[in-house]
A protein has these predicted regions:
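Compact, glycine-rich, soluble single-domain proteins
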Residues: 2-142
């Protein structure tokens, strides 16, 4: 079964389809980072229409996200409030890998009004890493 799942391709047309523009309606406080989780496709590259349950499972298991906003104290020493020696781990517009569980999650309508975007606020130390490759090709493993 896992072998079949690894062969399914979703074929996003572009980055805006995977991370559609939306207004999160919030800016993170302190050392928190606001990210938008990659939006699941309605159908596969081969034309198979995905059920709502499949799309929801994909959305809640995807760990690739676009950084939307960074709190004023993110990536700073908690005692001195000075920036970390290595600097910020990520900036708005960059892509990161986030934990599957945790964070404060909610959805908002996208700018088109057709889909919902899943947004999550994490503590800066909870981010797993920066995506250096194509964020559209990284698959969710369920």
């Amino acid at each position: 079964m896992q072998e079949l799942a690894n062969k399914v391709e979703f074929g996003y047309a572009d980055i805006d389809e995977a991370f559609p523009p939306c207004d999160p309606g919030i800016h993170p406080f302190g050392s928190r980072v606001l990210v938008q989780i990659r939006t699941p496709k309605n159908k596969t590259k081969g034309g198979i229409i995905l059920t709502t349950e499949t799309r929801e499972t994909d959305a809640w298991n995807t760990q690739i996200a676009k950084v939307v906003a960074v709190g004023e104290l993110a990536f700073k020493n908690r005692t001195t409030m000075e920036p970390w020696p290595e600097g910020s781990w990520c900036e708005p517009g960059e892509f990161v890998r986030v934990p599957k569980y945790g964070g404060d999650r909610w959805t908002v309508k996208t700018a088109s009004g057709e889909d919902e975007a899943l947004l999550v606020i994490f503590n800066d130390l909870d981010l797993v890493g920066k995506v250096t490759g194509d964020p559209l090709t990284i698959k969710a493993f369920i």
